[in-house]
Every structure is written in structure tokens, then in C-alpha cells.
Amino acid sequence: TFNSVLGIEGGISVLGTSGIVEPMSEEALVETIRTHLNVLKAEGRRWVIAVPGNMGAGFLQTYLKSCPGKYKSKDEASGICDQTEQLDRQSSDCSDRNSSVNPSEQDEQKKSLEKSLVTMSNFVGKTIDIAAELGFSGIVIAGHMGKLVKIGNGIMNTHSREADGRMDTLLSCALSAGTEDLELLRKIQGSNTTDEAMDHLKQAGILEDTIRVFLKRAAWHLAHRSRDELKTGMIVFGTKGEYLGETDDAAEILKEALSELKMQSLCEEEDHRR
């Protein structure tokens, strides 16, 4: 399975007569991203939510349910709840406003959100390029730190064969965050995974500061890639789906995208009644 909005769901389609299944080329994957963005554009969307894959999508769902206020003002946090309250009636922050939504409507709204999420795989840069080319107003990327940490080093194709830079990014961010602990830096450099490196940073009490530096760097690289033709933002999560942080413009883009999704759902409901 790759993308339900394109009808690729619950299996694979084998084209041709040989019966031999071959992996999709990078070109085919990028064209799939383009097709999804074209679908959203045809629906009148201006704001994009992109995820690397199922993990990022799942983490984002959890984020929307919990409506965290970290890195946001009170108004911004409540704004996100206002836009997402109908996605899950069990959200403790949003349940009081959501009594009119029945379970079947919830399911439809969640499906609508899932269909709106653009699966970009490793192609961060290409996804931004296409979104800018098609005239979108902004894109927010959500996913696991282990994948998105590379953006802090300007790496826009996150496949392992293209580049790594994970530990170098975290090490330099820790230095910029103010650490002078050489032993900590050696531990980061010697870590096998991003999670291991972040554990060392957490034990040293400098994880949050390091992530803040990383997010500023990532924001710069995303804006540089977009040539400022559209707003860009990013939200990162830990291995267990815990919210780690977001870039400055992420909340605004997310709210705009969810507002569009809500309006589309209302229009579809009205069409269905007719």
C-alpha cells in the first residue's frame, strides 16, 4: 500500500504481462506525490500537511488529539483545538466543544484527514518544490526526529544512501546550545541512533535547548529550499510519539490546513444531504 487517496489501498497492482513485481522508481514516487498535490489543489486547498509515512501520520493524529500548548501562546493552542475538535471527541482539551459530532461523522472526518496527508517518503525537497510550483501557500511537515533530523543539516532527501549527518547535526546543535561537555559530544558522535543520542542529551539536561537550535536551523533550510515562495514548517516527535517541538510557522500552517479540511468536510456533508 502507498496512498489511499489514489486508490492504492489494501494490496498492490501489477501492470504489464510478466507478473514480475518491481520496486517503484524514485521518479514514480515523486510523480505520486505530485498527483496527490494536484488532487488537493483541484479541491481548492492552499495549505499542505506532509508526512514521511505511516509513523508520522500516526504521531500527528496523536498530536491533534492532545492539542499540546508547548511552543504556542494560549490563543494558538486553543486555535488548533478549535480546528481539530471534531476529529476526536475523546480529546480532553476539546471534548466540551464537540458534543454535536456523532461517531460516523468522526470516522468520515478522520478519513478525510488521512486522505489529505501527503506521503512524501524521503523526498522532503521534491515535495516542497512541487508544492511551490503548484502555488500552494504553505506546507507543514510532521514526523519522527530520526528521519527529520537530517533537515537540520540541509539534507532534503532523507534516504540513508543519500546522506546521514544525524549525529553531526545533533552534535553541532548541542554545541550551539551551549554545552562544553566533551564527553557528551563524544557520546553523541558514537551513537548508533538518534534516540540514543537524544537520551544522552536528556541525561545531560540539554535536550530541549538542542532541539530548539535544531528547529531554527531546520526552519532556515526549509525556507531556503522553498525560496520563500511558500511558508514552511515542521513538527517533530520522538520514537513513542511524544511531541518534541515545532518551527515558528508550523502552528499557523497547521491551523490553516485544518481549517480548509473542516470547510471541505462541511461542504461534502451538505452535498450529501442534497
Kindly give the residue locations of the regions a language model identified:
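N-terminal loops that bind phosphate or other acidic moieties
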Residues: T1-A77, C81-Q83, N102-S137, K147-R274
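Basic polycationic patches enriched in arginine
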Residues: C81, R89, C94-R97, R273-R274
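Short acidic/histidine-rich active-site segments
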Residues: G143
